Amino acid sequence: TDVANKSKRPIMISFNGGPGSGSLWMHMAYTGPMVLNIDKEGFPVQPYGVKSNPYSVLDVADIVYVNPVNTGYSRIVDRRVKRETFFGINADIKYLAEWINTFIQRNNRWESPKYLIGESYGTVRVAGLALALQNRQWMYLNGVILVSPTELGIDSSRPDADGRTGPLGAALRLSLIHI
């Protein structure tokens, strides 16, 4: 960031879906200052290219786009490292929580408001990371943003779903209990 007082500027750590898909789509379709010129269905429209994103939060927050191992151009460099270190839900969450902790420390961002944002499978990742950061790194987040959280059981396109099933469904129905 180029802001003098980093402690007041929020930081958002962004993960795309996948597994396998890099964070490019979070950058170029959702949160970046420029986005692809696409229609509401996600198809390119003419003129092809990019356009300004009036919804980008870059003017009020720093965004860190993360490509976990084997997404985007991220690969295991040392062939002696066991694949189990990075692959699997728990392994993924463990090493990414450690990486986030290191990143926050090295960039002196402990006092900054911290947010995780995940899209599709990234929603599963950030849900697990929120817990791991709190329990293992003593890092309490200011928020978690879920984009297209189909992996959390709220996919209303499934024929057997009412749009409020799975573990998140109970939380979504909670307000109905109090009415």
PLM regions: where:
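N-terminal cap/lid subdomain of alpha/beta-hydrolase-fold enzymes
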Residues: 1-87
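A short beta-to-alpha transition loop/helix N-cap that caps and shapes the active-site region
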Residues: 22-23, 150-160, 167
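Active-site nucleophile loop of the alpha/beta-hydrolase fold
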Residues: 68, 145-154
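Alpha/beta-hydrolase active-site loop
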Residues: 86-104
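Alpha/beta-hydrolase fold nucleophile elbow
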Residues: 109-120
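Residue in the alpha/beta-hydrolase core beta-strand immediately N-terminal to the catalytic nucleophile
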Residues: 115, 143-145
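Glycine-rich nucleophile elbow surrounding the catalytic serine of serine-hydrolase chemistry
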Residues: 118-130
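Conserved small/polar residues in nucleotide/adenosyl-binding loops
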Residues: 177-179
